[in-house]
Amino acid sequence: MNGLGRPLPIRPLVRYSSGGRDLLARHLAAGRRVFARLDRAPAALRGTMCRSQPNYFLPLDKAGIDVFTQPCPLRLVLEGTVRGTGGLRITGEDCATTVAGLHAAGDVATRELVTGAASGGGSLNGAWAISSGTWAGRGAARFARSRGPLPPRGELRPAGRAGMRPAGPGVSRPEVDAFVAAVRDRVLPLRHNYFRTARGLTESLRLLDALWEQARDRLGALPEDGRTALRAREAAALAAHARWMYRSAPAGAESRGVHRREDRPATDPGLAHRLLVSGLDRVAVRPDPVAPRRPAEAGVP
């Protein structure tokens, strides 16, 4: 709205362009608001669109927005592994992982085995959630039965440290919240995470590595403060995931999919493989041992 209470004019950014997403991101990163309107959708198809994708139109209906005639605000959302790219590595048909007894399912598990390099959403993700949940549950049950009785409690040793068992005294909830804010400051801004450069990735890693040392040595809560203890462990997981993400990004010295390198705008055919990331204090990145087939081997001229 302008000073007179009248709506400001909306200027079209892009109509039909493969660079529409980047243009949208640049305007959002600059602090501008971006809107969309589906006014070019044929009238005969609008009802079908609403029925076939209710999850898209329902929030707009609740907000009182007719997206076919009115502009609706847009924003970019970080979805982590929800869209089928990345996740815990699956090593067997029972959704086993590289950690004995840990079977992954749903959004937390990698889905490249069923989606390839494409992002999985909608019915594909729903089918994967049901199928992988069934397979993982059976695999976990078989593993548990094969282990026999549990050893006496006194023989068990806890494995987790960061955010749970710090070397020093625990921290307060405000300190945990400040830690989360510091991690988010390197992950959420589009200038850091979407428009990537070698220099920016190096700077993000430097800050995140320092935050990880804090998570390992200081982040934790007193046993009687259960809510802060949970929040501290979540904060440590957030820092770990951010480091995995930014440690693997430099290995992809190209632009591919949603991984955009401002200093490497082209796609490198030699990097058409997945990256495996592991480790906590020292993060390792290596190519997937299953090498991709070359076009000639795949029967493509």
Task: Describe the residue ranges of each PLM region.
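Long, amphipathic alpha-helical stalk/connector segments used for oligomerization, subunit docking
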Residues: 143-228
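A conserved FAD-binding loop/helix module that cradles the flavin
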Residues: 111-140
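Mobile, glycine/GP-rich and aromatic-enriched active-site lid/loop segments adjacent to catalytic centers
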Residues: 1-120, 189-301
